[in-house]
Amino acid sequence: MKIKKAFITGITGQDGSYLAEFLLEKGYEVHGLIRRSSTFNTSRIDHIYQDPHTPNCRLFLHYGDLTDGTRLTNLMHEIKPIEVYNLAAQSHVAVSFLIPQYSAQVDAVGTLTLLESIRSAKIECKFYQAGTSEMYGSTLPPQNETSSFRPQSPYAVAKLMAFWSTVNYREAYGMHATNGILFNHESPRRGETFVTRKITRAVSRIALGGIEKLYLGNLEAIRDWGYAKEYVESMWQMLQQDKSDDYVIATGKGATVREFARVAFEHVGLNYEDFVVIDERYVRPTEVEALVGDASKAEKILGWKAKTDWITLAKLMVDADIEKVKSQPK
């Protein structure tokens, strides 16, 4: 039987690492796009890395970048994947205000470049685009596939172009191209500058006597937080459908940053009010007040439903960060 090949951009990130694990377990040969850096940035996938010289190796990493169309086209010719997952992005909302042009180049134009590389290579494959709930911006919750997009950051604007580029290639060229509109999804592998991980890392260090304060911005922002490990399964399920479409992936439950902090601190027997300090530097020029998704379409068509609620997730992340701090040399 011919082995299935998948190509993942952003394989070294939170979602990419979980997706790579998931696809390897399903018997895929997984190819990942990585950027060259002066230090290794593969910590999230080191545990599944395989020496390409070993027999039956099924994980391969390729240097490249979403801004290099020639390289992407050559990789499509060489690998001939049946599934392409575009997870790579400058995905930090606050940072996108500082580097808007770069965010647009990677998140918007980069997606278009990858789509065109697939088309130019003339390969038959299914394409998944990582959308984001940030595209809804100021639209009131609950947000679903028919809700209006009102982006409030350069990141969201760039992702919206990527969304419509995916729709355009689906309609113009008959490409099996799907958008997954994922609401906030977290895990112990979440980047350390994102608010949930920033909270759980601080809780672990405060609990173990490392630091004294946690500086945050808008505590009243409401988000729908789910478990990233579960969310990547929906990406694969979308590409198993005969017809490509767009799907919201969410838990349907919202909580404020304040509530997340409270639960995280209470998990180690502390009161968040004793440690959290508001720093106006972390307040964004345009705030998105509330994002809570309606994933009923995904449940009906894909059979996907979130299993882990945000409270369980917060505790899971605190526990993981405590173990990480304990394992570090003193």
Task: Label every PLM stretch briefly.
Residues 25, 32, 37-40, 60, ...:
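C-terminal substrate-binding subdomain of Rossmann-fold SDR/epimerase-dehydratase oxidoreductases
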Residues 1-185, 239, 308, 317-323, ...:
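N-terminal Rossmann-like NAD(P)+-binding domain of SDR-like oxidoreductases, especially those catalyzing
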